[in-house]
A protein has these predicted regions:
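Structural motif
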Residues: 72, 79, 104, 112-114
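Double-stranded beta-helix
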Residues: 110-155
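Short acidic-glycine-tyrosine-enriched beta hairpin
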Residues: 84-106
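Surface-exposed loop/turn positions
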Residues: 60, 95, 103, 111-113
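Glycine- and acidic-residue-biased ligand/ion/polar-headgroup-sensing regions
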Residues: 67-86
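A short, N-terminal "cap"/entry segment at the start of jelly-roll beta-barrel domains
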Residues: 1-53, 141-155
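Conserved short histidine dyad/triad with adjacent acidic residue
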Residues: 47-68
Length: 155
């Protein structure tokens, strides 16, 4: 990654945080209970993997969690667009891709979508697994270490 890309990443993170905060102020985002009803998640643990199968209804705008580890994802049904620091990506099922450490996306769901992620973990509970794979914010040591490595590689 170049230093310019790192700056772009920081700007995207800042704008995404502002979007989330402004959305909370005007009650744009769903509360956790409603979100679980609208976006049910099927959780599976097997062979050192935590698999999350998420349903996302048409016309939903969502901001993903911040990822602390690399993982594959699969779009099994539907279509969506997401925005990250690299720009817009339009996806139609079937599709698979990779999520990198520090990724957070703004997503718009065009059609009812089934989104699956697979995470390597020795966790046996949802709470423990999520604490290992998702960061509360970009100040998480795993995320900042990734950014520091980018800086070191460009100096």
């Amino acid at each position: 990654q170049s230093l310019a890309k790192l700056e772009n990443k920081k700007e995207f993170r800042k704008k995404t945080k502002e979007l989330c905060e402004e959305g909370k102020e005007i009650n744009f985002w769903y509360d956790e209970e409603t979100l679980q009803e609208i976006n049910p998640v099927k959780h599976t643990f097997i062979g050192g993997c935590y698999i999350r199968e998420l349903f996302m209804p048409k016309d939903q705008l969502a901001v993903t969690k911040i990822h602390k580890q690399d993982n594959p994802f699969f779009i099994m049904k539907g279509s969506l667009s997401f925005l990250n620091e690299d720009g817009w990506l339009h996806i139609k099922a079937p599709y698979h891709g990779l999520t990198k450490v520090g990724t957070q996306r703004i997503m718009y769901i065009h059609e009812d979508t089934v989104f699956i992620t697979v995470h390597s973990t020795d966790s046996k509970t949802i709470k423990d697994a999520e604490s290992k794979i998702f960061a509360e914010d970009f100040n998480d040591p795993v995320i900042t270490e990734e950014d520091l490595n980018t800086l070191k590689n460009n100096i």
